[in-house]
């Protein structure tokens, strides 16, 4: 319950305040009560994980509006008007890069091309590596 939780709608807010919920218990399963200061509404809880880095490209409109619109563990990611369902990044960060010389080979595109908890790291070469945790 609070104004800065993920999934709370951005302003501007209506001039007429409304309280559709007072706590998370009043929302259906998978939702929580979002307090924007003037408007309390039940919004879908975001799925765990982070959105992957999204390559710029042509925008063909929104496919999803929130994580609940996406199948399985996929998340609704992207800028407004270009939102799509993506598999989330795995936790952790890529280790510092050592100098790579030689052939540029792409072994993975995203984290879910990698086994276990390994992440897809680097740009050239791009390969699966064990993550670092801060």
UniProtKB/Swiss-Prot annotation:
Nacreous layer of shell. It comes from the Eukaryota. Residues 2-45, 46-89, 90-132 form the WAP domain. Disulfide bonds join 8-34, 17-38, 21-33, 27-42, 51-77, 59-82, 64-76, 70-85, 94-121, 104-124, 108-120, 114-128. Keywords: Disulfide bond, Repeat. Pfam families: WAP. The keyword tRNA processing does not apply. One of its GO terms (molecular function) is serine-type endopeptidase inhibitor activity. The keyword Metal-binding does not apply. Inhibits growth of calcium carbonate crystals. May inhibit growth of certain crystallographic planes in the mineral phase of nacre in the shell. PANTHER family: PERLWAPIN ISOFORM X1, WHEY ACDIC PROTEIN WAP. This is Perlwapin. It comes from Haliotis laevigata (Smooth Australian abalone).
């Amino acid at each position: 319950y609070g104004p800065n939780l993920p999934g709370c709608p951005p302003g501007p807010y209506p001039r007429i305040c409304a309280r559709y919920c007072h706590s998370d218990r009043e929302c259906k399963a998978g939702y929580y009560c979002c307090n924007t200061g003037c408007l309390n509404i039940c919004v879908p809880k975001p799925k765990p994980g982070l959105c992957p880095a999204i390559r710029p490209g042509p925008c063909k409109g929104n496919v999803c509006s929130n994580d609940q619109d996406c199948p399985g563990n996929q998340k609704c990611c992207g800028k407004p008007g270009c939102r799509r369902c993506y598999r989330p990044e795995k936790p952790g960060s890529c280790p510092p890069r050592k100098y790579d010389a030689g052939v540029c080979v792409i072994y993975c595109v995203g984290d879910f091309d990698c086994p276990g908890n390994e992440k897809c790291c680097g740009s050239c070469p791009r390969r699966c590596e064990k993550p670092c945790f801060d």
